[in-house]
Amino acid sequence: MATVGGAFKDSLTQAQKDELHQIALKIVQDGKGILAADESTGTIGKRLDAINLENNETNRQKYRQLLFTTPNLNQHISGVILYEETFHQSTDKGEKFTDLLIKQGIVPGIKLDLGVVPLAGTIGEGTTQGLDKLAERAAAFKKGGCGFAKWRCVLNIGTHTPSHLGMLENANVLARYASICQANGLVPIVEPEVLCDGEHDLARAQKVTEQVLAFVYKALADHHVYLEGTLLKPNMVTPGQSSASKASHEAIGLATVTALRRGVPAAVPGITFLSGGQSELDATANLNAINSVQLGKPWKLTFSYGRALQASVLKAWGGKDENIAAAQKTLLHRSKANGDASLGKYAGEDAAGAAAESLFVAKHSY
């Protein structure tokens, strides 16, 4: 293979590239997606509070154990994003969660960003912190069994947002994170989330998403990120939560695929959508619609869902040991539905019950 020298000399060896590419491909294998279980202590506390359960380490461990010990989870889940606390936790039998997942053929991942902070010089926009000592942290998580990482940046649609500065800064932060991850053997999941808060229509959501993706992939190129060893975790293109105009699943699918075709290089192995506060059923139906669009789609299109996989699971569990099997059955059902949707083979289901409830949270943070 030809080598590149000078200012464009590769910082990664071929062996490093091969490993990153293989991990990315494993995560986006047909019919599978990611379970995002990386909620911060505060966020998971809100979920536990909804079922009248105290937010303490014991209950958080018990809930994550319920998720990760679900029988046959690996039939539909290829990766799990962990929060740092969860990364260090074990089952009641003393087996580390990371080892439990690896044994099932599921790739453990880690949330590396440290949350959104205000971006000076903008009107209400933010950037994401956590770059300090990131290389050390990434190396430690790789040594501990993780194969990938996630970093979330947030942009909102308003009269004057997202601004040029907001898009540029967040794209560069994502690119710095991605290059550091790859140097330490972790596949970076790049997450530029355009929030669904607002009154904007589908067309504006599509335009903003296209612009954000353009900034992101320019920054990734500037930072010499190896695209074949990355994954993208974007929002679907939907009207704003307060928009007067609604959109069908088919319209959302077409707008989303169109935006991706205009902004995401074919070298990227896969796109793992966030659910963005959609109901469980909408998140699944929209993923199915995206995969059913009759346009060229060079990437795998699958899911990286948190709320849209867990909301009805939490309700089924209710914090009671006698409900664990029922809750795990619910998780397996939702995972299979989304796995089918990632293939464009979701047949739909009854729109009654918890799965149909909106999971929208204004200005949502993890």
Swiss-Prot record:
GO CC, alphabetical: cytoplasm; cytosol; heterochromatin
Record-annotated membrane-spanning stretches: none
Active site residues according to the UniProt entry: 191, 233
One term of GO molecular function: fructose-bisphosphate aldolase activity
E.C. number: 4.1.2.13
Binding sites annotated in the UniProt record for substrate: 60, 150
GO terms classed as biological process: fructose 1,6-bisphosphate metabolic process; glycolytic process
UniProt family annotation: Belongs to the class I fructose-bisphosphate aldolase family.
Name of the gene encoding the protein in the UniProt record: aldo-2
Organism of origin: Caenorhabditis elegans
Positions of the record's site feature: Necessary for preference for fructose 1,6-bisphosphate over fructose 1-phosphate: 366
Highest taxon above the source species: Eukaryota
InterPro entries: Aldolase_I_AS (IPR029768), Aldolase_TIM (IPR013785), FBA_I (IPR000741)
Name of this protein: Fructose-bisphosphate aldolase 2
Enzyme type, top EC level: lyase
